[in-house]
Curated annotation (Swiss-Prot):
In the C-terminal section; belongs to the protein sulfotransferase family. Keywords: Repeat, TPR repeat. This is Uncharacterized protein aq_1088. Residues 487-761 are annotated as: Protein sulfotransferase-like. TPR repeats lie at residues 35-68, 69-102, 103-136, 137-170, 172-203, 204-237, 351-384, 419-452. InterPro entries: P-loop_NTPase, TPR-like_helical_dom_sf, TPR_rpt, Ycf3/AcsC/BcsC/TPR_MFPF. PROSITE patterns: TPR, TPR_REGION. Pfam families: Sulfotransfer_3, TPR_16, TPR_19, TPR_8.
Length: 761
């Protein structure tokens, strides 16, 4: 028994949870015969997502029968996993009195205090752990992060450098080191040092260090050039190839990244067995990355076919994660959840699986189960406080607030993480009604994002300006009624955060309606139009001028393209809802393609929309959704929105239903009856309980729509009125056409990118 217990502890401490779990299952009955065995089985059950079974085993353990630091240390860890922090602290401290104390006990005490924001206590115990095991890179790294959070950059730098001397390929430590040098204004020194080294001895290691440093510093164009040159000079080194892919992904160059991955996978002669000892495993990971990019680009069928061809696919957590993403894109949230639950059984401590499962469960309204799994994530990774506070509906302890403030204000923490902490902290402070501090934090979070994106409001203004000029009554009259007669699509559109998700969920709870979410098909049609024109022998004009070349054949062809793709998502319901908010840019095209389609436009108080957008950490921040991170940019987008919708109403009188968000919150049944009547749908009582549906919600409104209709967001802007001068000034300015010199700059940027999807990051 003692050798089995020792072996299990060794596996667990080395983070080999897969073998740890298998060994527990193989020796389950044997382990039940001892107190220490029951504790280890409790840990196994917790990692397997079965906290109730862990609690049952814990209740059978007699703490007084444990007479070793090891046994008490495991018991304290199990208490910690189950959220019984006071018991965990008491038992772990009791273990200190025994002679067999090891570095793991001190490390666990450090993690316990760190998770509570008690940095001094955490530092004390992690330093004790390090004194027993000076070469433990994980403890060096944790201490480095702790000193970062305390603002002690030089101490943190020393610890990360020590970790890197022991483990040169420790990427996380390398990133932290770079961030510290960046915050100390010493990044140029490091970059110059690497460039000099590259001139003297241009080897793979220097290319990798330089590329990673530039990437972490946000100098993406330089990083891309370095990785590209390195990959060409050293084609057999996989790290340079992967570095290039990561930079391309960060730059939003999805197509280029996917093309390279496809080339490298089709011809694997570049793989050197010495440099890539696990060749098959490495190529499999590249294959998963390619399919991830395919899913992002909405090539779902291609990705799915390739994933199903993977041999022994059940042995890869990535297979489950990517397959669940495909299911979510197809609005099959329940299937995605079941698949990920199966993955959790096989990989109980895989953070990627657990995080994806939390996301899916939240989207289908299984909030209690999502909270349980989030607690497992925090137990495995105590720094996941941002997600933990989100799951607790932004109710945070004082210690958690301190951690969030530290993350937000630490210049050595990645900007993306700092911004995420800021957006969450804003919601926490808003919930506490500390509105002034909340908005100050929100400004800081948005400014951090702005430093990372390249957005110009004039690009969208120019497209709207040209659309208004091109879509004349004469053009509409020539094409009116020539599109596809289908009544199947219902388009819900308007400014992001105006109530489009709520409206989709109401309609989607009707038995005749399938809520498809934010479909990319209308923007895709717009992007494909030049090729379509060329194919039929017409001048390949870009949008919106392309509408001048349209005829009945092209309209019906575009509509059929849309209907074919919708049919792959659902073939059972007679109606389907497409709720891509920014389809307001393309209402003219939609109503010409589908003259019998229903178009529902959400209108909401401009300032409420402005505040709500500014409060969201949108994932699609590199595209058109970049407008949401600056109050003036939001004002310009609101002006664009108002101008184009006024134009569509003039061209298509009576064909667009105006749904007032405030009226919906005040008179829900009356408004919903009008909505169903407009959509030619019979009344069903179930539409009033839309929030009970298990269909997934994938947008920024993921939590709100699970609570039913609520009025707390109406007139919300008044809390922050004194901060809204920038957006108010732009709204008063109204929609102004760009002048000729400005037009020259933007005439090649016709289609704004990133319209598809605006989920929260």
């Amino acid at each position: 028994m003692s050798s089995l217990i020792s072996r299990l502890r060794k596996l667990f401490k080395s983070r080999n949870t897969h073998d740890f779990s298998n060994l527990c299952k193989e020796n389950y009955q044997t382990l039940l015969s001892s107190e220490e065995g029951k504790i280890l089985l409790g840990i196994y059950h917790f990692l397997s997502g079965e906290p109730q079974k862990a609690e049952e085993l814990l209740s059978q353990v007699s703490e007084n029968s444990l007479n070793s630091a090891q046994g008490l240390s495991d018991l304290g860890l199990l208490y910690f996993f189950l959220g019984r922090v006071e018991d965990a602290e008491r038992v772990l401290k009791k273990a200190l009195k025994f002679s067999d104390v090891d570095d793991a006990l001190y490390a666990r005490l450090g993690a316990l205090y760190y998770s509570q924001g008690k940095l001094e206590e955490a530092q004390h115990y992690w330093e004790r752990a390090l004194s027993l095991n000076p070469n433990k890179v994980e403890i060096l790294y944790n201490l480095g992060v702790l000193h970062l959070n305390k603002g002690e950059l030089e101490k943190a730098l020393d610890l990360f450098e020590r970790a890197l001397r022991l483990k040169p390929d420790f990427r996380e430590a390398e990133e932290k080191k770079t961030l510290i040098l960046l915050s100390l204004n010493r990044i140029d020194e490091l970059v110059e040092e690497y460039y000099r080294e590259l001139e003297k001895n241009p080897n793979e290691e220097v290319y990798i260090k330089l590329g990673n440093t530039l990437y972490t510093a946000g100098r993406l164009a330089e990083a891309r050039a370095v990785f590209q040159e390195g990959a060409e000079k050293f084609p057999h080194d996989p790290r340079l190839k992967l570095g290039l892919i990561e930079v391309l992904k960060e730059e939003g160059r999805t197509y280029q990244a996917g093309t390279l991955l496809k080339e490298w996978l089709e011809d694997t002669s570049w793989v050197d067995e010495e440099k890539t000892p696990n060749k098959d495993e490495f190529l499999m990971q590249m294959r998963f990355r390619l399919n991830e990019l395919r899913i992002q680009a909405s090539f779902l069928d291609t990705a799915e076919k390739d994933l199903e061809k993977v041999e022994n696919k059940e042995d890869y957590p990535e297979y489950y994660i990517l397959k669940s993403k495909i299911l979510m894109e197809r609005n099959k949230g329940l299937e995605a959840a079941d698949l990920l639950r199966e993955a959790k059984e096989r990989f109980p401590a895989h953070l990627g699986v657990l995080q994806e499962l939390v996301h899916v469960l939240t989207s289908i309204g299984e909030l209690e189960e999502a909270k349980e799994i989030q607690s497992q994530i925090v137990a495995i990774n105590p720094s996941a406080v941002i997600q933990q506070v989100e799951m607790e509906d932004y109710k945070a302890t004082d210690e958690q607030i301190q951690v969030l403030e530290t993350l937000l204000n630490s210049p050595a923490v990645p900007k993306q993480t700092r911004a995420s902490a800021g957006f969450v902290l804003h919601k926490v402070l808003e919930k506490r009604k500390d509105y002034d501090k909340a908005f100050e934090v929100l400004i800081k979070a948005n400014e951090l994002v702005k430093e990372e994106i390249n957005y110009d409001w004039r690009e969208h203004r120019f497209m709207i300006q040209r659309t208004i000029e091109v879509f004349t009554p004469e053009v509409v009259e020539r094409l009116k009624g020539r599109g596809h007669p289908s009544k199947r699509p219902i388009f819900v559109l308007g400014m992001p955060r105006s109530g489009t998700t709520l409206t989709e969920q109401i309609l989607g709870s009707h038995s005749m309606v399938y809520p498809a979410g934010e479909l990319p098909f209308v923007p895709k049609i717009v992007n494909l139009i030049p090729k379509a024109l060329q194919y039929v022998g017409k001048e390949p004009k870009e949008w919106p001028e392309a509408i001048l070349e349209f005829d009945e054949r092209l309209l019906k062809s575009a509509a059929q393209y849309y209907l074919d793709r919708v049919a792959k998502l659902d073939s059972e319901h007679p109606r389907i809802v497409d709720k891509l908010p920014h389809n307001f840019d393309y209402v003219g095209l939609i109503l010409l393609m589908f003259p019998n389609a229903k178009v529902i436009h959400l209108k909401r108080n401009d300032l409420d929309v402005a505040v709500s957008n500014y409060q969201q950490n949108f994932a699609a921040k590199h595209g058109t959704m970049g407008f949401a991170f600056d109050l003036r940019w939001i004002g310009h987008m609101l002006n664009d929105h108002r101008a184009i919708m006024e134009h569509w109403h003039k061209l298509f009188p009576g064909q667009i239903y105006e749904l007032d968000y405030q009226r919906l919150t005040e008179e829900p049944e009356e408004v919903i009856r009008e909505l169903l009547e407009f959509c030619e749908l019979p009344w069903e009582d179930r539409v009033l309980e839309y929030y009970k549906t298990k269909r997934p919600v994938k947008t920024a409104s993921i939590k709100q729509v699970r609570k039913g209709i609520y009025r707390s967001s109406v007139e919300k802007w008044r809390r922050y009125e004194k901060y809204l001068t920038p957006v108010i000034e732009i709204l008063q300015e109204g929609f102004k056409k760009l002048e000729d010199p400005e037009i020259e700059k933007y005439q090649d940027k016709v289609i704004p990118k990133g319209l598809v999807g605006y989920t929260v990051g």
